[in-house]
Amino acid sequence: MTPARIDPDRVYLDHAATTPLRPEALEAMLPLLTDGFANPSGGHAESRRARVTLDDARDLIAELLGAAPGEVVLTSGGTEANDLAVHGGWEAVAADRLPEAHPPALVCAAMEHHAVLRSCRALAVRRGVELREVPSGPDGRIDLEALATACRGDVGLVSIMAVNNEVGTVQPLGEVAHTLSLGSPGAVLHTDAVQAVPWLDVAAATAAAGLVSISAHKFGGPKGSGALVVRAGSRVRPRIEGGGQERGRRSGTPNVAGAVGMAAALAAAT
């Protein structure tokens, strides 16, 4: 098999699609791909060491994102994090409603990444949820008046991206959160912050959001690693059942090397 390599005579500028692996991430990951490969969910000495390594990576990710370690759910990337936020976040809110109650509405920006937009549309069809897609203005910023209208009544979840993946518009998440608090204070705000790192101080920019998605390969980390921050006061119901990893929110054997690489890249990028 011939490896895909970047032509040395060309300049790679497509960093919004993916980034080269940072040397810091590669160096941190290599020992875990050869010697430190144990399953951190096990009970023997090697597993315990792997668990310490995983916990250290989670602690660093949490610190850099302005979260507590227990709020960081490790995922396979931004798409899974967004899917868990949309489906899991909405389901957690809906579960608090009476069985006979009408399901709470779902709100998102019409310019969301497909990982959010298609998740919202799929949820709307599967659960009979009213989906309200909010337009943006000529500059790509969310129309706050239209958002205020969309957030009236019983809304379960609102998803507005932090930075647009096509044109780079930075959304006013503080104003979005304020608008949401006036119209439907019981709703959860999710933001897809995949394109925000390393260009913004993500901890500050997303402080108003209850759910925050990131993806390692957008800031020099490995592909196949991401995270969803579930801040205190917000909840998600799992999309993947199994061994109960990630505090029951995302089952599956943890990708220790991926988490370590993501933590190293995030530290280098911020």
Which role does the model predict for each range below?
Residues 1-270:
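Pyridoxal 5′-phosphate
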